[in-house]
Amino acid sequence: MSLDPKVVALLSRPNFAHIATLMPDGSPNVTPVWIGVRDDKILLCSGESSLKIRNLRRDPRLALSVVDFHDPYEEAQIRGRVVEFRDDSKFEIMDEISYKYTGKPFPFRNPEGRVALIIKVEKARYTKLPFQHTPPA
């Protein structure tokens, strides 16, 4: 699927995402994550022993919610699946993502079991509501 340029722009900025994976009993597990985007695929890194990786190895389906950091009324909802679990022990993908969020390489250098997920988007919805984020003081 070719991503809408507005979705790509939202994913390309340092916005936090929340990934939902499925537990063995079918219940959801949601985790905040950093993400990257390349060639209409979403990139995400984690440790091999993390719950989200274990869940995705068992069932590669996932959902992502991404909200603009400065305008929480701009968001994307994404469904997809992991199409590749790639070794990232050299932190090539993780550092690329970390630079986007912090301007620095990823600080925790634990290469054993470092994995990058390559996620194929199956459905994406972009929304921008006409509201100003002005919560009461």
Give the predicted meaning of each segment:
Residues S50-K52, D71, H133-T134:
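Short, surface-exposed beta-strand-loop junctions and turns on beta-sheet-rich folds
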Residues P14-E48, R54-L56, L64-V66, Q77:
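Short beta-strand segments
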Residues S2, E74-A137:
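Charged, gly/pro-rich active-site loop segments
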Residues M1-A17, H133-A137:
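Extreme N-terminal tail/first-helix region
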Residues L3-V7, K52, I93:
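Hydrophobic alpha-helical segments typical of transmembrane helices
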Residues I53-D59, E75, A137:
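A short, polar/proline- and glycine-enriched secondary-structure boundary/capping micro-motif
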Residues D25-S27, D68-P72, N110-P111:
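A short beta-turn/loop motif at secondary-structure boundaries
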